[in-house]
């Protein structure tokens, strides 16, 4: 029985990457832009109903909610060639259409105001599912709507659907270029608190690394949002491929995540993908073997998180877990040989306190999408170097907070009224504790470290109850 997943796209960034994701899914399942199955899509063997449901007129409709506080991006989707794909009852745009002004507090406050309307849509989708497995949230952590309203929805989903999994695809801001959102460090910190406490799994999409990959690997001198979004949609579709083209393992979300996340707080995953191509670069052809793909996935330059730094401290960082999803016509014996070769050459540095093994899921490629390569691979990895990304967010926050800069923008809203800034302090403590925990994972006695925190047992129990299938 398929375990359905409801996708919630929040804010400008969330809706843009969500749109690219649905375009990719339509291509892979042979679904036309209007939601009707293409004449050639007769092979079957795929599970369309994990992400789509079929209407009475045979249209395939995404199990998706499109939410924004300003209309520009959603209007663009409604005027695009995919306008008939979505269920228009599942589109929410705030009446005043003024957005959240890149202010987390505004997005969160409006989340409270509109929660009944949005949760009605969520409940309707959930009631239409036979065996709902969980939710996927697409958003960014730096702006106002995706971060603030996304945070409120995470808390609400966690409360109302406590037994369902919540996975997020969270876009982290570019740390190299100067941002046009001056309060980005505040927004990021407040959102990170919710991602730590209210999500079961966060796939980190780091704009710094995505831009670097587009420049260095794809040779695009000035990558556009559309090009980096196409990288994101590639990762999103590849990470769900075992759910949609099921094999004998990893064919539901619980199965995917249980092996990657041994401890509840350390649930931030980084990704790598190979071979990468964009439309203007299809003429580059090379021989892809399983070993070649698996070796490339471990190379720093293919990893889509910039915290994977080339410093001495980063060399001590360790993998907590790795899952490689290999797509294509692959002989399982090749996989076994490749894993042996990687082990012999000590290409991977694992933690001391858990099994040091790379897990591999084999998946069929979509018969409807032609690619120039025979084998492709996605790596989902839980790696302790991700803490450097959080440390950067903390550092940027401290700079602003020291100067008391832009805090008046937040004091206008109930959570920060009467100069109550305790929410910032609490968020900072939680992220500092997260950084400490990832650092502690690198030592052999991490298990004892976990026992020092009396609240840890409760958190473990909460996650365990979700991972009982």
Swiss-Prot record:
InterPro entries: Gamma_tubulin, Tub_FtsZ_C, Tubulin, Tubulin/FtsZ-like_C, Tubulin/FtsZ_2-layer-sand-dom, Tubulin/FtsZ_GTPase_sf, Tubulin_C, Tubulin_CS. GO terms for biological process: cytoplasmic microtubule organization; meiotic spindle organization; microtubule nucleation; mitotic cell cycle; mitotic sister chromatid segregation; mitotic spindle organization. GO terms for cellular component: cytoplasm; gamma-tubulin ring complex; microtubule; nucleus; spindle. GO terms for molecular function: GTP binding; microtubule nucleator activity. Its main location: cytoplasm. Belongs to the tubulin family. This is Tubulin gamma-1 chain. It comes from Zea mays.
